[in-house]
Amino acid sequence: MSFETKPNYLLLTNPDTPLSVCTSPYYSPSGKTASIPSSEASKPEGTNGQWSHLPTGATYVTDEFSSEFQIQNGSTAAQSGNANNYADPLSHRRYFNNVNGYNHHQFYDTASQASVSSPATSVTSSLSPPDSLSNGHTTQRHHIGKAISFCKVCGDKASGYHYGVTSCEGCKGFFRRSIQRKIDYRCLKQQVCEIKRESRNRCQYCRFKKCLDSGMSKDSVRQMKFRNAMRDDKSPDSVFVPEISTLERQEEVDAVYEAVLRAHTTFSFYTDIKIRSIVARPFNVRINEDSKMNRLNAWQIYAHEIDVDIKEVVNFVKEIPKFNFINGNDKAVLLRKNAFPLYLLRIVRGMSNRGLMLRDGRLIDFKSLQLLYGSLADEMLAFANHIITIGCTDGDIALFIVLILCQPLTTEQQFSTNFKSQLQLLEMFDFYKKVLFQKMTCRIDGCDTYKQLMKCIHELNRLNELHKQQLNILRENLSFLNLPPLVVEMFQLSTLPLPVNHNNQENQYTPAPEHQSPQPQQPTPNQQQTPVHC
């Protein structure tokens, strides 16, 4: 609708007539009424009408305005100084009111500063009046610029959010170089230098200190450096850094992590807290002149300790989130394939130069450990020391155990074991790799630890092959041993000895029937059965 002439509006000759719209205390241009009329007290809320005055002093009420209207030249409202403006007779300020349905109550100190704005003008145009009143029909648009942010360190204009703080490019680069180069600064004064844009280069110690005080994170620099290195490294041994998708929310990652850590703490004797509370005591193994007898004797005793841990591994696997998507037969295949790597990861905190600490405090000295595993014992100790040295927590070890268990099988391994859950296994492996990455990179030096831990996958698989070779002596003498059936099954001891030189990571095997111990073979007349001393 448009403001044309007086007949288009309902005239209210009596200003005290009750109005159905919001009124103002200074509605009369003649200034004869300086108080708030009684009609304001009875105004209803939520109406869209307007009110104004004619030069004669008569009050009129407009209809509910539409989204667009124009003030035309020559109209009564425009000639009277724009129907959307009214003057304060006391302060001589002119108020700008009701543009496009909004009541801004914008005012100017003098009438000459008031603008005649087209109703089609945006709201921001009313805040910036034009220099002249003559151009009443020209639409003027003024845009509010983006707010300028300043560097929290030096006060210069910020370029973005860097390393956890709004900062400029100069302080961003300075902080990154200081962390990557591990520079040790010194202050020549009292470490209270003022850091401003003009003086930020005078004292690097105080500037670096203010970067840290402002909230810049050293870990953010290390994580960025690690990601860039992984992106640029195209070698086969490079570590893949997974990206956390939006579907794997932080809540899900935390829930999975807590479930795995809780299961590991419940079904492991070698957590950080438990191993510290164990009191060591000697574990005697009877030593004879025959080295073969000694080794078989040691395994006869040691196998029962492994049997207990294998049962705990099975209980741990039952609590792994998402592992129920894999059928029971395929779970057994994965456990048999990775039995030794899982066992080694679980006992890393129990191994030392002294030997292996058992769950009840008995200590298998390192000499006896070499009797059991041969040269593999030295590599087991080196691997355990490496895991502890790089700073793996119980949570890291628990997630890494799941990751090793979920390693995808080769095509040959799938065929030989009739494995059916390869797709589900790939999804689980990728998921737990992302969970492990996210949890480890949240702490200082977590990126470097993650990178080193991923390289341990290849080392674990290599040790697994060496372990299979070391157990050939048990396969050859299985008829003379009374080993727990679960140990025989998990380590595949009922098959023929494995060749030393082979290319496959795992040879074909025929699992022994569960819950049945292997039948002892009758010795030939030329052989004499050797008793086993426990």
Curated annotation (Swiss-Prot):
One cellular-component annotation, GO: nucleus
Domain of life: Eukaryota
Low complexity: compositionally biased ranges: 119-130, 511-534
Tissue-specific expression: Most abundant in embryos.
Positions annotated as zinc finger (NR C4-type): 151-171, 187-211
CDD domains: NR_DBD_DmE78_like (cd07165), NR_LBD_Sex_1_like (cd06942)
Residues of the NR LBD domain: 252-493
Result of knocking out the encoding gene: RNAi-mediated knockdown results in 43% lethality of hermaphrodites. RNAi-mediated knockdown together with fox-1 results in hermaphrodite embryonic lethality. This hermaphrodite-specific lethality is suppressed in a sea-2 bp283 mutant or sea-1 gk799 mutant background. RNAi-mediated knockdown results in hermaphrodites lethality due to failure of the dosage compensation complex to assemble on X chromosomes in a fox-1 y303 mutant background. RNAi-mediated knockdown in a background containing one copy of the fox-1 gene results in the viability of 3% of hermaphrodites.
Region Disordered, residue ranges: 30-53, 119-139, 502-534
Gene3D superfamilies: Erythroid Transcription Factor GATA-1, subunit A, Retinoid X Receptor
Gene Ontology biological process terms in this record: cell differentiation; dosage compensation by hypoactivation of X chromosome; hormone-mediated signaling pathway; intracellular receptor signaling pathway; negative regulation of transcription by RNA polymerase II; positive regulation of transcription by RNA polymerase II; primary sex determination; regulation of alternative mRNA splicing, via spliceosome
Main localisation: nucleus
GO molecular function terms listed in the Swiss-Prot or TrEMBL record: DNA-binding transcription factor activity; nuclear receptor activity; RNA polymerase II cis-regulatory region sequence-specific DNA binding; RNA polymerase II transcription regulatory region sequence-specific DNA binding; zinc ion binding
Location in the cell: Nucleus
The keyword Transcription belongs to this UniProt entry's keyword annotation: yes
Protein name as catalogued: Steroid hormone receptor family member cnr14
Feature: DNA-binding region: 148-223
Keyword Cytoplasm: no
Family annotation (SUPFAM superfamilies): Glucocorticoid receptor-like (DNA-binding domain), Nuclear receptor ligand-binding domain
